[in-house]
Amino acid sequence: APLFSHITFVMQSVDNIIIRNCRFTMKGVPVLRTGENKIVAWRDGAQVEVGDPDCIGIQADKVSAKTNWGGHIWIDHCEFFNGGAANKDRYDGLLDCKNNVQWMTFSYNYFHDHDKSCLWGKGDSDVYENCRTISFHHNFFDQIEGSRLPLQRGGHVHYYNNYMRGCEDGWDIRTGAVAYEEGCYFEDTKSPIRSDRGG
């Protein structure tokens, strides 16, 4: 499988995307002299700083998110990893979705050796009508030493047949989230499912 390293994929307001059989890591991204990691992108001809890297970020344009959404995305049989807890301030999520994105499936993926795995909704205000309809199935989380397996704000998620091993937090259900879990296995995971943080 191809390995994408030192690259952060940002899918903004796109539709009908399939990513299969790839490996993604931000491990080893250089740090600037200030000691901070900065990722730079080009938007509308201008250079902008986009912050700490996600392996993949899926989002709608936040200015027009109510009408200009992204969706119909399938990510299948991929591997996501970074540097583990020792580098937790250097990397953000492995697979993050924010703003008004809809109709996504994440299947048969392997997430491992990282601090924060998957974020769905960047904050309590990131809850749109009918947003983030997600099927999340047959994924393997191994040694996620922090959180976000996933952290879900808003949206409707069917979370089934996933396996979590040696993780800190499991599925964190928060504001406006509708969640249905079945057939998942949590091995040596301290908080498999929680909804006590504003869910």
Name these PLM-found stretches.
Residues 98, 151-152, 173:
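Glycine- and other small-residue-rich loops at beta-strand/loop junctions that grip anionic moieties
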